[in-house]
């Protein structure tokens, strides 16, 4: 049964022809699974709300939709009854509200009054329910959808007892990546000196694009950013507002009609997607000749600018687990957290104090769900977690693209035994070196993992790529392309040795790929693997889409424009070697840039 596209309502907002077409595409995409799983289809107006928030980029709007749905499910924001306790009291507390004026650009203005928040008296998920409820009321307006939202965090008269770091992180994550509204700016007003420390923690989550929108202001400076007509009296404005009664206007006459999102939120999307939809080039895919022409037209600077378009986008999802105080020491770098939505979860074992956290993310490959696990270079305090992950995910191949030290800095710990017949024990897992092969550009080590609890043994092949320079990228992609083929061949042989698998199952376990942070060289390696697979099977590829999608699973993948440009260069180098383009033609063009 084909999903039906919701008709455009008579009272729907006016859209351009391009926006209407994007809305139809969005609804077709979302309603594929609403039909399949007997969930009510999404309405036209709700679709427009998500598309407005992402400037009618269909792919990003779909990602936002699922992030919004998952956030509401995770935080228990479902079946809201604003006339019943405790939600009613939380709404009427006045700590969060929507002003009845707009800024000069037409943006709606939301106000959080910190001094009214008392964490010891509030239940956090109820606070979030009230926040969602009131924000939803704001973005029901087409004007707000089109012109965005200004968020004022009023800290005047508050103290440390009014502050809740975890709530602050959740609200920020909500505003920047999990709510259908264009966030224009955040004004933090009257922040005490002690706020600098928690803000520095929160700011680790922010991309430059979001950080630039946040202003920390004195009360006297607010009118430089918003006219007095848009501000309450206590912030130097003209609006008379009684926070104790203001929010009565947002309560419905009765509990109202059921939220159509309740059914969608409560529905659990199956964990496995159709492999044929994973990392398949979209409508903007290029043939290899089109790619040559594209690179010659854009040139190096143009490709760098294309990367900046990707980098400026906020991560889609949340980082709650990575930023939990108990897990911070497990992150090699404080500014490289791990998305909650795609993180690998370890099994908690009785008698052990470990959490289920490791800084590692499932990443899709070409036509394969969870083809890779992108992770950081293990720290001494995470060696055991690393090998537990390898065991639990039935990993057969590990790819390391860094050395232990580079440029005089420690990049990765020695988490496996280096010499033949040596072994290291990690809890109930013992890792033994069965042999080492030293090649020109890489080292191959065969390892055996012995699970003493289950009395089982498995072999894992560890590859360490040695030809990546300490700084920048390789001058030629030849050695990396050869290395990638060796890795793929080893994975295929290892999977084959497991025996035939029935049709419909995941064809193979993930390959673990890591560098130091687990995003730069790791993202480059995986992007190249995906794009070359696209090219070999379909004759077309899409670098921009591949990297953009990858960053929704392993946030910040590909760290520099140089690495992004290297992907293009490597693909063209591969194409020349395979005779897909005339020898020397494409590389000469690139080398001249």
Curated annotation (Swiss-Prot):
Record localization: Cytoplasm
Region of interest (Disordered), ranges: 1-21
Example GO molecular function: protein tyrosine phosphatase activity
Biological-process GO terms, alphabetical: negative regulation of neuron projection development; positive regulation of protein localization to plasma membrane; signal transduction
Listed EC numbers: 3.1.3.48
Catalytic activity: O-phospho-L-tyrosyl-[protein] + H2O = L-tyrosyl-[protein] + phosphate
Pfam families according to UniProt: CRAL_TRIO (PF00650), Y_phosphatase (PF00102)
Stored CDD domains: PTPc-N9, SEC14
PROSITE patterns linked to this entry: CRAL_TRIO, TYR_PHOSPHATASE_1, TYR_PHOSPHATASE_2, TYR_PHOSPHATASE_PTP
Chief localization: cytoplasm
Presence of keyword Hydrolase: yes
Record InterPro entries: CRAL-TRIO_dom (IPR001251), CRAL-TRIO_dom_sf (IPR036865), CRAL/TRIO_N_dom_sf (IPR036273), Prot-tyrosine_phosphatase-like (IPR029021), Protein-Tyr_Phosphatase (IPR050348), PTP_cat (IPR000242), Tyr_Pase_AS (IPR016130), Tyr_Pase_cat (IPR003595)
Residues recorded as bearing N-acetylmethionine in the entry: 1
Purpose of the protein: Protein-tyrosine phosphatase that could participate in the transfer of hydrophobic ligands or in functions of the Golgi apparatus.
Family: Belongs to the protein-tyrosine phosphatase family. Non-receptor class 3 subfamily.
Protein name as it appears in the record: Tyrosine-protein phosphatase non-receptor type 9
Organism in which the protein naturally occurs: Rattus norvegicus (Rat)
């Amino acid at each position: 049964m084909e999903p039906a596209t919701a008709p455009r309502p008579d009272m729907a907002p006016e859209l351009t022809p391009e926006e209407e077409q994007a809305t139809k595409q969005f609804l077709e995409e979302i309603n594929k699974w609403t039909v399949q799983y007997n969930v009510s289809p999404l309405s036209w107006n709700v679709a427009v709300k998500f598309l407005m928030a992402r400037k009618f980029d269909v792919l990003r709007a779909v990602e936002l939709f699922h992030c919004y749905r998952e956030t509401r499910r995770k935080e228990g924001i479902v079946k809201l009854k604003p006339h019943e306790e405790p939600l009613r009291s939380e709404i009427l507390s006045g700590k969060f509200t929507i002003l009845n004026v707009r800024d000069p650009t037409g943006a709606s203005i939301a106000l959080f009054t910190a001094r009214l928040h008392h964490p010891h008296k509030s239940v956090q998920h109820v606070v979030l329910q009230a926040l969602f409820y009131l924000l939803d009321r704001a973005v029901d307006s087409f004007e707000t959808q089109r012109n965005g939202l200004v968020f004022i965090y009023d800290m005047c008269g508050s103290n440390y007892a009014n502050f809740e770091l975890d709530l602050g992180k959740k609200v920020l994550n909500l505003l920047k990546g999990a709510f259908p509204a264009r966030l224009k700016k955040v004004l933090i007003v009257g922040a005490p000196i002690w706020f600098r420390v928690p803000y520095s923690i929160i700011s680790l989550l922010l991309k430059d694009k979001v950080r630039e929108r946040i202003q920390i202001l004195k009360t006297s400076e607010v009118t430089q950013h918003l006219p007095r007509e848009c501000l309450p009296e206590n912030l130097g404005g003209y609006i008379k507002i009684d926070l104790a009664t203001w929010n009565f206007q947002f309560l419905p006459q009765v509990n109202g009609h059921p939220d159509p999102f309740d059914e969608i939120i409560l529905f659990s999307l199956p964990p496995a997607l159709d492999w044929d939809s994973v990392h398949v080039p979209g409508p903007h895919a290029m043939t290899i000749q089109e790619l040559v022409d594209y690179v010659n037209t854009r040139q190096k600077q143009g490709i760098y600018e294309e990367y900046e378009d990707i980098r400026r986008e906020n991560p889609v999802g949340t980082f709650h687990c990575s930023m939990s105080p108990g897990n911070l020491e497990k992150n090699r770098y404080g500014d490289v957290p791990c998305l909650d939505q795609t993180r690998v979860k370890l099994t908690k074992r009785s008698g052990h104090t470990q959490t289920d956290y490791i800084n590692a993310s499932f990443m899709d490959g070409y036509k394969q769900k969870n083809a890779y696990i992108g992770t950081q270079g293990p720290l001494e305090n995470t060696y055991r977690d690393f090998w537990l992950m390898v065991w639990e995910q039935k990993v057969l191949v590990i790819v390391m693209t860094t050395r232990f030290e580079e440029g005089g800095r420690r990049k990765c710990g020695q988490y496996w035994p280096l010499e033949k017949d040596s072994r290291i024990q990690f809890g109930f897992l013992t890792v033994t070196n069965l042999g080492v092969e030293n090649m020109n550009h890489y080292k191959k080590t065969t390892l055996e993992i012995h699970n003493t609890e289950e009395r089982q043994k498995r072999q894992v092949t560890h590859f360490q790529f040695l030809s990546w320079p300490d700084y920048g990228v390789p001058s030629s992609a030849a050695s990396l392309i050869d290395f990638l083929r060796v890795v793929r061949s080893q994975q295929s042989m290892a999977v084959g040795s497991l025996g035939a698998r029935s049709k419909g199952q995941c064809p193979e376990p993930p390959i673990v790929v890591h560098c130091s942070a687990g995003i730069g060289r790791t993202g480059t390696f995986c992007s190249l693997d995906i794009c070359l697979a696209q090219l070999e099977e379909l004759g077309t590829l899409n670098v921009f889409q591949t990297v953009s999608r990858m960053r929704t699973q392993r946030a910040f993948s590909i760290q520099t424009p140089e690495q992004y440009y290297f992907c293009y260069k490597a693909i063209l180098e591969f194409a020349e070697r395979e005779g897909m383009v005339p020898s020397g033609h494409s590389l000469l063009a690139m080398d001249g840039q």
